[in-house]
């Protein structure tokens, strides 16, 4: 599962809409949509706010990406 799918999953588990999450982290709904569809990536400051709002950590968000990195190196 990619980071964008995990973001969407975590947001839904938190019971938030894209608009609500955007307001919590200071982004537009369209920005959150971009993150969740993989069309854009949040910078570290926004990602930190998203993880705090969704009560998840980087291990949850990026676990597959980290696994793939270590499998290839």
Predicted regions and their residues:
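Short basic helix-loop element that most often maps to the first helix and adjoining turn
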Residues: 5-24, 49
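DNA major-groove recognition helix of helix-turn-helix
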Residues: 36, 46, 62-65
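DNA major-groove recognition helix of helix-turn-helix/homeodomain DNA-binding modules
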Residues: 43-60
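Short, charged recognition helix plus adjacent turn
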Residues: 60-73
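Recognition helix of helix-turn-helix/homeodomain-like DNA-binding domains
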Residues: 26-41
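Short amphipathic helical patch at the helix-1/turn junction of helix-turn-helix
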Residues: 1, 12-13, 41
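Conserved hydrophobic/aromatic packing and binding residues within compact polymer-binding modules
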Residues: 7, 21-22, 32-35, 61
């Amino acid at each position: 599962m990619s980071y964008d799918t995990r973001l969407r999953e975590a947001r839904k588990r938190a019971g938030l809409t894209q608009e609500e999450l955007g307001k919590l982290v200071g982004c537009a709904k369209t920005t959150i949509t971009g993150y969740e569809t993989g069309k854009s990536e949040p910078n570290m400051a926004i990602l930190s706010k998203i993880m705090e709002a969704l009560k998840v950590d980087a291990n949850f968000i990026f676990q597959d990406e980290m696994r793939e990195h270590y499998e290839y190196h």
